[in-house]
């Protein structure tokens, strides 16, 4: 088995590449063509996470974002924003049947934000994940969605267009700490799964080549809750655009783009708020960062 190769990204080249995947705004498009995103998550205790993911996908540029949550979380999530479409179905006995018609219309599915760990909910979402892979939907898996994979990594092994977004602890739970264990478990994922490991320097793992691309540090020392949800939501939109632009490595490009955007939003907001910085402050910076670094002057 070949050694893991850690490679610093070429940031100037990436910034040029990012602009090639961003679709130009034109009058001949209809609602939904710039992205329809689904977020599977949201429980009584965790209503902020699915909101952050869903609204971030739209702030980046998706047209529509749906949240599929537990019934007791729905009124709270609805109250956060009228821009989101909220489905209170996750704790229904026929949840998968209710979700399936929507899945067929969505471009990318985010699984995990605010999901919680109730056994019945986790089993339902496991079945939703199986359905997503059957429908060949691009998937981003984060937070408690990754918890499902701890003992069931085969759910994604060999599948196409899947991005996992673990933090350092979630990464160790999934792949272990010993470098040989990491390589062995990574190799089982196949060539259709990319891992975005979140940290001071986000790292994008390409499992089938043993390559690890290291992003610049960026961000700030402020680590408030919700930043990972901003990442998963923005990643979903970038993933759809990257796939639509027929880039040879769409998951890698999307992972780099979302990592860069969130770090820049954190850095920009930190200059204003310092230690008081919250994830909601970062959301308000997405537009300025996007215009500055992701769009050509004529994109509009």
Swiss-Prot record:
One of its GO terms (molecular function) is ATP-dependent NAD(P)H-hydrate dehydratase activity. Its cofactor is Mg(2+). Residues 14-293 form the YjeF C-terminal domain. (6S)-NADPHX binds at residues 114, 167-173, 229. InterPro entries: Carbohydrate_kinase_pred_CS, CARKD, Ribokinase-like. Gene3D superfamilies: 3.40.1190.20. Its EC number is 4.2.1.93. CDD domains: YXKO-related. GO terms for biological process: metabolite repair; nicotinamide nucleotide metabolic process. ATP binds at residues 198-202, 219-228. HAMAP family: NADHX_dehydratase. Catalyzes the dehydration of the S-form of NAD(P)HX at the expense of ATP, which is converted to ADP. Together with NAD(P)HX epimerase, which catalyzes the epimerization of the S- and R-forms, the enzyme allows the repair of both epimers of NAD(P)HX, a damaged form of NAD(P)H that is a result of enzymatic or heat-dependent hydration. This is ATP-dependent (S)-NAD(P)H-hydrate dehydratase. It comes from Drosophila pseudoobscura pseudoobscura.
């Amino acid at each position: 088995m070949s050694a893991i190769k850690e490679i610093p990204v070429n940031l100037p080249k990436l910034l040029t590449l990012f602009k090639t995947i961003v679709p130009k705004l034109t009058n001949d498009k209809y609602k939904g063509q710039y992205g329809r995103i689904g977020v599977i998550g949201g429980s009584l205790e965790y209503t902020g996470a699915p909101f952050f993911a869903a609204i971030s996908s739209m702030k980046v540029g998706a047209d529509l974002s749906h949240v599929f949550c537990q019934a007791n979380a729905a009124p709270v999530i609805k109250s956060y924003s009228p821009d989101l479409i909220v489905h209170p179905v996750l704790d229904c006995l026929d949840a998968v049947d209710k979700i399936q018609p929507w899945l067929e219309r969505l471009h990318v599915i985010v699984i995990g934000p605010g999901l919680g760990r109730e056994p019945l909910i986790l089993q339902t979402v496991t079945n939703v994940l199986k359905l997503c892979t059957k429908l060949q939907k691009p998937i981003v898996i984060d937070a408690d969605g990754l918890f499902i994979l701890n003992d069931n990594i085969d759910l994604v092994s060999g599948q196409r267009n899947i991005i996992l977004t673990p933090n350092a602890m979630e990464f160790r739970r999934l792949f272990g700490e010993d470098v040989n264990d990491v390589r062995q478990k990574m190799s089982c994922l196949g060539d259709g799964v990319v891992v975005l490991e979140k940290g001071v320097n986000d790292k994008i793992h390409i499992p089938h080549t043993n390559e690890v691309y290291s992003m610049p540090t960026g961000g700030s020392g402020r680590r408030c809750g919700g930043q990972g949800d901003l990442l998963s939501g923005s990643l979903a939109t970038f993933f759809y655009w990257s796939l639509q632009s027929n880039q040879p490595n769409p998951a890698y490009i999307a992972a780099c783009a979302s990592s860069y955007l969130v770090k820049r939003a954190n850095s920009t907001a930190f200059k204003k708020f310092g230690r008081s910085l919250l994830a909601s402050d970062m959301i308000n910076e997405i537009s300025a960062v996007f215009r500055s670094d992701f769009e050509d002057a004529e994109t509009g």
